[in-house]
């Protein structure tokens, strides 16, 4: 039987990262041309370690949670909408790039639509949404874009970019904390209940990180754990609910047998609020962000259903 180290080596060999398709010079030029506030020293840090943000968050999380482990972090493109952990001597978290880019794109299109419901922006966001659901959600293929298209896509208002990326990092932290919980269990395969327990643990980590940032106990560079994003993990689960809704329009009903549904995962997280959300939390703004997010999801669902009925969705889907 293969050891966890051998499994990881094989997994990494057959699932190369997509990040290395780009040269350092291309990344540098892209960031400097798109983000006016980009600082050369920050980009130099990025060039030295592409995953320095992930590693900084992980280090902060381990310290706050007093976890006596030294996990490694890997980003690979295995075309799986998940993350996983290999229980090697130093546990290795593998975050699939399909999931990374899907969550980022999902937040950008939803928040962009909330900010601008003009016909032009709606058409762009709707097409991006269908592509996200069909290409990445169903076919598990990352979309590819030209350099010019990437620059165009990044011309979002700064507040939308900041909100989307902060929501992404909170969601990323939730997913990683979920995986770390599995390390404490010696079972070969995680159970249905263990998945829910992992969610519960991960959400307590999010609350602790938000509390720590309020108290000045997190690095200033990691200014992403805001009270108004305390519901980010639930926003992330909206993508999987939307994917199920989309597939149901085409007669494909989702079945959850060995793994809890996104609805159940949300329900269990909501059940934690009375006990785990501190009284000192200002939840008003966070509830507002979440409700605004849900309004856009409802609008997208209405448009998906409408365009399926008139045949337009099939045309968009095929292009």
Language-model region placement:
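Active-site recognition of the HExxH zinc-binding catalytic motif
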Residues: 174-187, 199
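Hydrophobic alpha-helical membrane-insertion segments
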Residues: 105, 187-188, 204, 208, ...
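Alpha-helical scaffolds flanking conserved acidic
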Residues: 165-174, 194-196, 219-233
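An active-site-proximal "capping" alpha-helix that borders the catalytic cofactor pocket
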Residues: 191-210
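Preference for well-ordered, secondary-structure-rich cores of eukaryotic proteins
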Residues: 94-95, 194, 256-260
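Hydrophobic or amphipathic, alpha-helical segments that drive membrane association/targeting
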Residues: 1-171, 185, 281, 287-319
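Long, well-structured alpha-helical subdomains associated
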Residues: 207-319
């Amino acid at each position: 039987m293969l050891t966890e180290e051998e499994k990881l080596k094989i997994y990494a060999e057959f699932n190369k990262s997509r990040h290395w398709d780009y040269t350092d010079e291309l990344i540098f030029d892209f960031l400097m041309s798109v983000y006016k506030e980009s600082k050369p020293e920050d980009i130099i840090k990025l060039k030295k370690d592409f995953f320095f943000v992930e590693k900084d968050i992980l280090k902060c999380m381990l310290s706050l949670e007093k976890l006596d482990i030294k996990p490694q972090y890997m980003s690979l493109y295995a075309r799986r909408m998940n993350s996983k952990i290999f229980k090697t001597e130093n546990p290795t978290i593998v975050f699939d790039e399909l999931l990374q880019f899907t969550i980022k794109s999902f937040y950008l299109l939803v928040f962009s639509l909330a900010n601008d419901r003009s016909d032009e922006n709606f058409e762009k966001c709707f097409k991006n949404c269908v592509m996200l659901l069909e290409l990445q959600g169903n076919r598990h293929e990352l979309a590819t874009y030209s350099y010019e298209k990437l620059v165009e896509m990044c011309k979002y208002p700064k507040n939308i970019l900041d909100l989307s990326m902060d929501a992404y990092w909170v969601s990323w932290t939730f997913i990683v904390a979920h995986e770390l919980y599995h390390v404490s269990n010696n079972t070969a395969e995680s159970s249905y209940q263990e998945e829910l327990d992992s969610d519960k643990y991960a959400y307590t980590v999010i609350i602790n990180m938000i509390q720590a940032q309020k108290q000045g106990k997190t690095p200033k560079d990691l200014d992403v754990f805001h009270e108004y994003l305390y519901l980010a993990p639930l926003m992330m689960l909206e993508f999987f609910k939307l994917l199920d809704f989309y597939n149901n329009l085409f007669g494909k009903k989702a079945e959850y047998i060995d793994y809890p549904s996104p609805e159940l995962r949300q329900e269990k997280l909501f059940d934690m609020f009375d006990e785990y959300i501190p009284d000192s939390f200002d939840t008003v703004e966070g509830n507002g962000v979440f409700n605004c997010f849900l309004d856009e999801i409802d609008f997208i669902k209405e448009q998906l259903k409408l365009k399926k009925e008139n045949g337009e969705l099939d045309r968009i889907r095929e292009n």
